[in-house]
Amino acid sequence: MGNNVVVLGAQWGDEGKGKIVDLLTERAKYVVRYQGGHNAGHTLVINGEKTVLHLIPSGILRENVTSIIGNGVVLSPAALMKEMKELEDRGIPVRERLLLSEACPLILDYHVALDNAREKARGAKAIGTTGRGIGPAYEDKVARRGLRVGDLFDKETFAEKLKEVMEYHNFQLVNYYKAEAVDYQKVLDDTMAVADILTSMVVDVSDLLDQARQRGDFVMFEGAQGTLLDIDHGTYPYVTSSNTTAGGVATGSGLGPRYVDYVLGILKAYSTRVGAGPFPTELFDETGEFLCKQGNEYGATTGRRRRTGWLDTVAVRRAVQLNSLSGFCLTKLDVLDGLKEVKLCVAYRMPDGREVTTTPLAADDWKGVEPIYETMPGWSESTFGVKDRSGLPQAALNYIKRIEELTGVPIDIISTGPDRTETMILRDPFDA
């Protein structure tokens, strides 16, 4: 039995994590975010009602669950307040259900200004960030000049630290990027206005999780973005600024690494990517357009059209290695309904003609990589909303089996629609 279950993206993000976390939290006592910030966009559909969460864990809609934002998350007070208000307006008592680590770095206005100034300066070489200040906030953390939630307990010292760090960043904004300086007094006033709300939710997360472990409570760790966007293991520099892989759970929450029991990789039945960066199986034809349209592939955070392509099992195998995945949840299988044939990328052909079955590491090494495909018959029957494996077409079952063979990991859950009821749980991670 696994008490501590991790749910993370096995591709480039947007795999459908929010729904699965929400589904599995039926049995959980805690749901923990451990990396990223409000650059995530987790969409939940419950009884036909849609909720998009960016920062607050997906367990917040359940009254039996305590949601925790761990130290690995960069926290925007403005984004948190906005999200809390939206939920509280719907009658959800967020403050009774949400806890924060005092070690969360704060994202403030100057981080957003820096993010946007840099993307503008990069021009055609822009990374395609969400423009929310995530990267600059992580930079401040590593440079040991960042302000944290815990700093809000001493308001005078906070004001002094803020003045110092803003002088540094405003100098860069004005003199290097030729952008406008950010107003110190406004940032201070805005942050002080919510300081007491934030500090009232602070808890020792590592201690809480250790006590939960000793009691045998079920805990869900909710990843954001996806494995192939990991700052260390992703397609650098076209990556996010945090560790999206399972290793980030321990460092981003304070749970001891030996206590992770099961890692569930969320795997879309095809591939998508937002922003720039390598994508060997990307489709520019009518099939790519079909996947985008059928899958409604537009970002929950930015509204940007996602790039679409066939499932890349070479890249997915890398995700298996990096995360020691226990099982997959296959999502959006129904998007492939109606295609005469479906393809799986099983290897890459390098520019020198070599065939390889592992991914390059640096983005430059992906140049000229061509996918080698295995083609399988598609299916015309609808898989949308099917709740039993026996109700799936044989061709869809063959596709699922082939993914398991190529990756060496069982598909434990199959999602056939956006609602939490449209799911087949073949093996529950908490029972595995």
Swiss-Prot record:
Any one GO CC term of the record: cytoplasm
Superkingdom to which the source organism belongs: Bacteria
GO BP: 'de novo' AMP biosynthetic process; IMP metabolic process
Residues that hold GTP according to the record: 13-19, 41-43, 306, 332-334, 415-417
Alphabetical list of Gene3D superfamilies matching this protein: Adenylosuccinate Synthetase, subunit A, domain 1, Adenylosuccinate Synthetase, subunit A, domain 2, Adenylosuccinate Synthetase, subunit A, domain 3
Location of this chain's protein in the cell: Cytoplasm
Swiss-Prot/TrEMBL catalytic activity: IMP + L-aspartate + GTP = N(6)-(1,2-dicarboxyethyl)-AMP + GDP + phosphate + 2 H(+)
Quaternary structure and interacting proteins, as annotated: Homodimer.
Name of the protein: Adenylosuccinate synthetase
Organism per entry: Salmonella paratyphi C (strain RKS4594)
Gene: purA
